[in-house]
């Protein structure tokens, strides 16, 4: 029975281990970046701003939609005649009237500014008075049919005149679509920058655990050597307490490093857009720190060339350029709206009438020669608010917005230039720090190995060995941090120059090179 339970527990454990092993998320830079494009909330929300801008464009296009309109009105009326009314001899004091009015038409505003209107109207009425309008006896409720077709064209002469003014709101909306796309690109780049920094922090935390564990191993080595030396009466027994204390301290540092590793993993998942459960499934970091030769770094980088690349590639700079164009158009529209409304309308109409009952009379009312009415005309409409405060206020606000945006654009360009200078300087310094950290690490390794040999020969103290071991560990950590600073400097320069991600037919893409190499000026 116990054997059976053991087998069940064993296979259950293997199954669970296999399940979690299969669900691990491969933690390489390109892979997690692609996951972020799909799952990161900031990226998703940024994409919705594009859809919102496209919806605004659709709203502006609605101004030029074809509008169909129709109306049907049915009315019955009972009018009590005056006593002196001669119609009382033919009807019993009450004049009963029935009326039907129907109209339908099409109205459209053209992109050249004109408004066209085509409408059809039909009217029918009858009453219980037995004589018609020509004093002929026709009997009660004899129908009268009237129909007409009207065509009008309205041309604005001042406000709203011309294609440039009429379509300006539509073109402004198109600029805001382009603005939202460029802003989305910069948002994606900034998110990938944060992911890159979080990844290098995760990789650093992972390597720190390795270093502390290696350090533990070195201390245990020293402990074993110390025990042997004590047995050989080459060292006092009191030295063992020092080594044990150092070992306990190193185990504490390893535990703290593992805690930092856990936090770094969760923070990387946060930057990607993963849930808590998904973040805990992130595997060990796959990509190592970039090397200096691999990065294509060179001394005396051309700041001017990188600034030029940034002005061509940065999404936020392109976005504010579109906003400036849109505000310029909005300003022109506000200026036009300060003008009076003066519209010239030309119209033609055709109508006819017929009397009688029956459905055939309804259609004959459009073609009957008798009662035909054909004409044309024009009208001039003038509208202008006396103070015109609304138009003047909007004009003043748009002028302020335009000038404010110019200052904002200049400030952004100024900050981009400063940021690129800082990024290049940071890269230069990180290379120097990395090279010096490597030299220091090699020296400390050599010194520690020498102290170990001396210890085995009984030529140095345990305290000296512990001191050199701590310096070696500190040097290894500083070397890792120097690498992290170098890696972050590369992606920061990429982000500042707008070369961290690229827009493809299927969305944003990137490759591993953007995390390992600085921008190549010749490619831009």
What are these regions (language model features)?
Residues 34-44, 51-66, 103-130, 137-143, ...:
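A glycine-/polar-enriched beta->alpha junction
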Residues 45-60, 187-212, 246, 264-269, ...:
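Amphipathic alpha-helical coiled-coil segments
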Residues 23, 72-151, 288-298, 332-336, ...:
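Small/polar, glycine/serine/threonine/aspartate-rich low-complexity segments that form flexible
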Residues 1-25:
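Bacterial Sec-dependent N-terminal signal peptides
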Residues 226, 243, 327, 342-346, ...:
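Extended, hydrophobic alpha-helical segments in both membrane/secreted and soluble proteins
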Residues 20, 78, 266-284, 289-297, ...:
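Acidic, low-complexity, intrinsically disordered peripheral segments
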Residues 182-306, 426, 433, 471-472, ...:
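Periplasmic alpha-helical coiled-coil/stalk elements that build and connect Gram-negative outer-membrane
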Residues 21-99, 153-168, 172, 234, ...:
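Bacterial Sec-pathway N-terminal export signals of envelope proteins
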């Amino acid at each position: 029975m116990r054997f059976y339970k053991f087998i069940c527990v064993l296979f259950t454990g293997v199954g669970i281990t296999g399940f979690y092993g299969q669900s691990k998320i491969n933690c390489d830079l390109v892979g997690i970046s692609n996951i972020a494009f799909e799952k990161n909330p900031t990226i998703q929300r940024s994409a919705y701003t594009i859809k919102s801008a496209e919806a605004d464009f659709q709203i502006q296009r609605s101004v030029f939609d074809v509008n169909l309109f129709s109306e049907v009105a049915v009315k019955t009326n009972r009018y009590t005649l005056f006593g002196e009314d001669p119609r009382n001899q033919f009807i019993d004091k009450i004049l009963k009237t029935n009326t039907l009015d129907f109209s339908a038409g099409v109205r459209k505003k053209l992109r050249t500014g004109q408004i066209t209107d085509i409408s059809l109207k039909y009217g029918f009425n009858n009453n219980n008075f037995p004589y018609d309008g020509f004093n002929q006896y026709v009997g009660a409720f004899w129908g009268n049919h009237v129909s007409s077709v009207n065509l009008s064209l309205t041309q604005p002469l001042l406000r709203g005149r011309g294609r440039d003014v009429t379509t300006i709101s539509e073109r402004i909306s198109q600029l805001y679509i382009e603005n939202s796309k460029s802003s989305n690109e910069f948002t994606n780049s900034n998110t990938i920058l944060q992911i890159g920094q979080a990844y290098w922090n995760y990789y650093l935390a992972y390597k720190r655990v390795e270093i502390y564990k290696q350090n533990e191993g070195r201390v245990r080595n020293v402990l074993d050597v110390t025990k042997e030396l004590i047995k050989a009466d080459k060292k006092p027994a009191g030295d063992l307490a020092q080594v044990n204390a150092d070992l306990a301290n190193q185990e504490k540092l390893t535990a703290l490093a593992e805690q930092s590793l856990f936090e770094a993993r969760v923070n990387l998942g946060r930057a990607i857009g993963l849930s808590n459960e998904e973040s805990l499934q992130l595997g060990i970091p796959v990509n190592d720190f970039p090397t200096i030769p691999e990065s294509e770094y060179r001394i005396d980088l051309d700041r001017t060339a990188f600034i030029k690349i940034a002005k061509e590639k940065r999404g936020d700079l392109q976005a504010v350029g579109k906003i400036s164009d849109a505000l310029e158009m909005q300003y022109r529209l506000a200026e036009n709206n300060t003008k009076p409304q003066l519209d010239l309308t030309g119209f033609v109409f055709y109508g006819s009438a017929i009397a009688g009952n029956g459905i055939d009379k309804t259609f004959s009312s459009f073609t009957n020669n008798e009662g035909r009415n054909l004409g044309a005309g024009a009208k001039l409409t003038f509208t202008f608010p006396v103070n015109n405060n609304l138009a003047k206020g909007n004009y003043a606000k748009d002028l302020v917005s335009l000038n404010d945006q110019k200052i904002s654009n200049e400030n952004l360009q100024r900050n981009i230039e400063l940021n690129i200078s800082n990024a290049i300087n940071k890269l230069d310094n990180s290379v120097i720090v990395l090279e010096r950290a490597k030299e220091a690490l090699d020296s400390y390794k050599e010194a520690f190995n020498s102290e170990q040999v001396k210890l085995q020969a009984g030529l140095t103290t345990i305290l000296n060995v512990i001191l050199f071991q701590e310096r070696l560990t500190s040097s290894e950590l500083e070397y890792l941090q120097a690498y992290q600073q170098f890696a972050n400097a590369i992606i920061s320069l990429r982000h500042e120059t707008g070369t961290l991600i690229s827009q493809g037919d299927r969305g944003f893409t990137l490759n591993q090179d953007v995390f390992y190499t600085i921008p190549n000026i010749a490619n831009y």
